[in-house]
């Protein structure tokens, strides 16, 4: 599959991307964040294409899972700075604020996609201070409720995640940070 995807990227013109974007926008849908998996393993030309694709779709950031390898964050940060286009590194419960701060130190356009449920579960503190300190680097938030100490996902209001406080901070400061409701439901098979 990776080779098929690589070949597809080499064939799809940015004109086709514009047509795709136009269809979505005509339906009232804006594409703000473009999720790209496997970007750290891509050749330079492919990474350039991903940035052009994201911009062509109308996005304001690329999202990808955070790497704990500094060389990955430096390399992708160089592309982000070259294209003057944010990369929001998505963190999980194992991601500490220092991981994002390290990424920030490597490139102006390295940012954070903070999943506030994962943040609470892994760091056992509110994400609000981190959001306040780094709001200019946060591309978007994933909203979910989890318990401290790597606890499970819960219905909103039953976990330890201060969802209301986070949303109020965004609203009161008028920060342009997209907050996306991430819902988890068990999937029935069969």
Model-derived regions, located:
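A short, structure-level motif marking secondary-structure boundaries and short turns
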Residues: 4-6, 34-36, 60-62, 150-153
């Amino acid at each position: 599959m990776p080779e098929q995807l690589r070949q597809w990227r080499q064939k799809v013109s940015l004109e086709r991307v514009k047509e795709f974007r136009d269809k979505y926008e005509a339906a009232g849908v804006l594409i703000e964040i473009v999720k790209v998996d496997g970007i750290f393993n891509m050749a330079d030309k492919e990474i350039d294409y991903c940035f052009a694709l994201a911009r062509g779709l109308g996005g304001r950031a690329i999202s990808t899972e955070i790497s704990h390898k500094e060389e990955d964050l430096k390399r992708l940060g160089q592309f982000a700075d070259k294209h003057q286009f944010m990369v929001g590194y998505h963190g999980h419960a194992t991601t500490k604020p220092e991981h994002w701060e390290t990424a920030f130190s490597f490139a102006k356009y390295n940012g954070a996609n903070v999943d506030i449920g994962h943040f609470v579960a892994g760091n056992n503190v509110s994400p609000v201070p981190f959001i306040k300190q780094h709001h200019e680097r946060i591309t978007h938030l994933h909203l979910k409720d989890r318990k401290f100490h790597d606890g499970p996902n819960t219905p909103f209001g039953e976990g330890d995640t201060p969802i209301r406080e986070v949303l109020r901070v965004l609203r009161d400061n008028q920060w342009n940070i997209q907050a996306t409701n991430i819902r988890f439901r068990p999937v029935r098979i069969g």
